[in-house]
Amino acid sequence: MTAPSQVLKIRRPDDWHLHLRDGDMLKTVVPYTSEIYGRAIVMPNLAPPVTTVEAAVAYRQRILDAVPAGHNFTPLMTCYLTDSLDPNELERGFNEGVFTAAKLYPANATTNSSHGVTSIDAIMPVLERMEKIGMPLLVHGEVTHADIDIFDREARFIESVMEPLRQRLTALKVVFEHITTKDAADYVRDGNERLAATITPQHLMFNRNHMLVGGVRPHLYCLPILKRNIHQQALRELVASGFNRVFLGTDSAPHARHRKESSCGCAGCFNAPTALGSYATVFEEMNALQHFEAFCSVNGPQFYGLPVNDTFIELVREEQQVAESIALTDDTLVPFLAGETVRWSVKQ
């Protein structure tokens, strides 16, 4: 006899960290987000990056054009910070409701980040303006110096960049994105109300052993890279505690299969189809389902000063198999947990 399925009804969630790419890839991946989430913070690391109001408006329209009829989805656009960015352009975009936040990529930290910031001092006028107007700063928190081990880059970023920055601009709202370490979990938990964090499903579900033991699993390779089990455990404990300044940010980052399964593969997990069920599984494993809705649907809007969504969705607890791949025009896309049986999924 099979156990009856369970249903979780939650306020419609938002994704506070998402890559949608552009062109045909954009058209393929947008529906996986727009059918589930009310809003998403869209990353600006296109080629070339989104650095002007005009570019953000055009990109937003391309996203909206890819949203299927019947989906009620609002993309929240971000500005890519560069050493040469004009603070007036940033403020104009924020005041006009085009830019929700600005994104700090240390130069060469991740995909399409070669235009990123070379030093905090180089963009201090921009950051001071953001502090003044109340615009959130979203941070990819890794140092990129060649001599620093890839597994240490987040912890080093906290001491060398994040803490000095927050000491200098004490009123600046900062989201420490896709945190992956106990160091970052402790730092955010011990911080004030102007510091928050997002966490991905892969960093809650897996550690570096899952990616490297018994063969390299390229579809678990993302940046920041998966860390040791002690770090994974710290992240799980943070979300399970009900801490209200951590929220859902999938960092869903699609790459065609041939760009992942290669001699020099790209970083990123395309988790949009399976992320919400993955988060539910983690919260269930941690006996913390009472905090699941807040993590997905309340904490983010609260930090950004936005209303929560007024519609609801349901997740059902019944085993389903994830597709092995998703068709692209001239390749395929391998989703997070491809071919695996998952416990929770969004009720269709």
Curated annotation (Swiss-Prot):
Sites of N6-carboxylysine modification: K103
Record-level Gene Ontology MF annotations: dihydroorotase activity; zinc ion binding
Reaction catalysed by this enzyme: (S)-dihydroorotate + H2O = N-carbamoyl-L-aspartate + H(+)
GO cellular component: cytosol
Keyword Zinc: yes
UniProt: Zn(2+) 1 binding residues: H17, H19, K103, D251
Binding site for substrate: H19, L20, R21, N45, H140, L223, H255, A267
Catalytic residues (UniProt): D251
Pfam families for the chain: Amidohydro_1
Protein name: Dihydroorotase
Functional pathway: Pyrimidine metabolism; UMP biosynthesis via de novo pathway; (S)-dihydroorotate from bicarbonate: step 3/3
Database matches in NCBIfam families: pyrC_dimer
Enzyme Commission identifier(s): 3.5.2.3
Gene Ontology terms: biological process: 'de novo' pyrimidine nucleobase biosynthetic process; 'de novo' UMP biosynthetic process
Protein family: Belongs to the metallo-dependent hydrolases superfamily. DHOase family. Class II DHOase subfamily.
Binding residues for Zn(2+) 2: K103, H140, H178
Keyword vocabulary terms for this entry: Hydrolase, Metal-binding, Pyrimidine biosynthesis, Zinc
